[in-house]
Amino acid sequence: MTTSDLVAGELAGDGLRDTRPGDTWLADRSWNRPGWTVAELEAAKAGRTISVVLPALDEEDTIGSVIDSISPLVDGLVDELIVLDSGSTDDTEIRAVAAGARVVSREQALPEVPIRPGKGEALWRSLAASRGDIVVFVDSDLINPHPMFVPWLVGPLLTGDGVHLVKSFYRRPLNVGDAGGGAGATGGGRVTELVARPLLAALRPELGCILQPLGGEYAATRELLTSVPFAPGYGVEIGLLVDTFDRLGLDAIAQVNLGVREHRNRPLAELGAMSRQVIATLLSRCGIPDSGVGLTQFVADGPEGQSYTQHTWPVSLADRPPMQAIRPR
């Protein structure tokens, strides 16, 4: 059982004791069983607009079902649904359009700025392509996402005061089929549990109450998103979390239980590269110099391991500036 599972269990009914940093916040800003209805949230919009952004890169197998889970909300709770495509070479765009989403490429979103690779770049550019007062990000590799993911995420922003960022938390199954096993009920979120949460405990312990600091499903005010830099690649979520805390404090952050999140689990080699970027971003946010050296991995060339091939994954320390400096609203 992971740390996140244990904390979720406490929220579900084991009780809270004011003995740990963040316990008061967990009682006030964490929704374990969100009860809002779509109709209630539509009424609470009070003239505010909501954009949902799906960053995508070669997600033809899942993009359609993710869009299908959100599209019934369009022209009601949701004002626009955008797929920000990062250069897919498969049928992601075709299937997204067929499902009813508007697809915007990185080039179209911000044509005057040369492209950089990575997820952080896609999310940053989506701010130029969208118009909502609230922006919801949902990963495109989700499997059978619950149709209430988006309503639950915007709930604290529409019904509360002072909240600017809403993170999600959930149980994360681990599909180990590639290793000859099956699907485990827990065990997903390996970078979160082995890298992000231990580092936050050391460097920003106040954020230890955030169950899924790297989760790709979250909502935020445009005011916040356009005022902070965006970290490159997979550092974008941890960068945004720390920036929000450092600028606005813990009470500007909330979290909502989305139940279960299933997605395409990645091999360890890719998780190593992801971890390297998360570490670089968190160190930089905490004022600790990073070497800027990429992660070198050694892969056995055969079952006997008699020789190894080196592969180095690059790491980036270059943030994108706040969008309001590029596109003042």
Swiss-Prot record:
It catalyses: an NDP-alpha-D-glucose + (2R)-3-phosphoglycerate = (2R)-2-O-(alpha-D-glucopyranosyl)-3-phospho-glycerate + a ribonucleoside 5'-diphosphate + H(+); (2R)-3-phosphoglycerate + UDP-alpha-D-glucose = (2R)-2-O-(alpha-D-glucopyranosyl)-3-phospho-glycerate + UDP + H(+); GDP-D-glucose + (2R)-3-phosphoglycerate = (2R)-2-O-(alpha-D-glucopyranosyl)-3-phospho-glycerate + GDP + H(+). Its EC number is 2.4.1.266. The keyword Hydrolase does not apply. Mn(2+) binds at D141, H263. Pfam families: Glycos_transf_2 (PF00535). (2R)-3-phosphoglycerate binds at G189, R190, V191, T192, N265. CDD domains: Glyco_tranf_GTA_type. UDP-alpha-D-glucose binds at P55, A56, L57, D58, E59, S86, K119, D139, S140, D141, Y234, G235, V236, E237. Its cofactor is Mg(2+); Mn(2+). Belongs to the glycosyltransferase 2 family. Homodimer. NCBIfam families: PRK13915.1. This is Glucosyl-3-phosphoglycerate synthase. The lineage of its organism: Bacteria, Bacillati, Actinomycetota, Actinomycetes, Mycobacteriales.
